[in-house]
Regions:
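Short beta->alpha transition motifs characteristic of CBS
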Residues: 45-52
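Short, basic and Ser/Thr-rich N-terminal targeting/leader segments
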Residues: 30-34, 80
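Zinc-dependent deaminase
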Residues: 1-26, 90-160
Length: 160
């Protein structure tokens, strides 16, 4: 019988604040403000913010950038025992990468009602066909994360 996993939530808000700071960096470049950090053993091993426009790469979501950086940092494509903090609920592309990289837990801020696949448009991580289970939790600093996104799009609409 599997032992229940003990989850340390004591630094969730601290790591989400790091992700929010990265989201602000992306916003300053005109990117949709989403930031992500990947943590293993209490240390940040990967950071990223959305950069598909500036990087001419449609896959350059914050989660992708952070996971790629983390994999390089630890010289391993698998990241067991790690937690991904991201300011917006992951999409299907990012959720697939999260499973393939064996991330243990995802903590996100704001819901993504149109493309979020963790809870909003389906519960991807609970699907029986997956060979890896990912724990997930939403709403951590959700109001701040949502406000940053809302303000970004409000300002973008005002410019057009």
């Amino acid at each position: 019988m599997r032992q229940p996993q003990i989850i340390d939530r004591s630094r969730d808000q601290d790591f989400m604040r790091e992700a929010l700071a990265l989201a602000a960096e992306g916003a300053a470049l005109g990117e949709v403000p989403v930031g992500a950090v990947l943590v293993q053993n209490g240390e940040i091993i990967g950071r990223g913010f959305n950069c598909p426009i500036s990087g001419s790469d449609p896959s350059a979501h914050a989660e992708m950038v952070a996971i790629r950086a983390a994999a390089r940092a630890v010289s391993n494509y698998r990241l067991p025992g790690s937690t991904l903090y991201v300011t917006l609920e992951p999409c299907s592309m990012c959720a697939g990468l999260i499973v393939h990289s064996r991330i243990a837990r995802v903590v996100y801020g704001a819901l993504e009602p149109k493309a979020g696949i963790v809870q909003s448009q389906g519960q991807f991580f609970t699907q029986g066909f997956l060979n890896h289970r990912v724990l997930f939790e939403g709403g951590v600093l959700g109001e701040e994360c949502g406000t940053m996104l809302s303000e970004f799009f409000r300002m973008r609409r005002a410019k057009t």
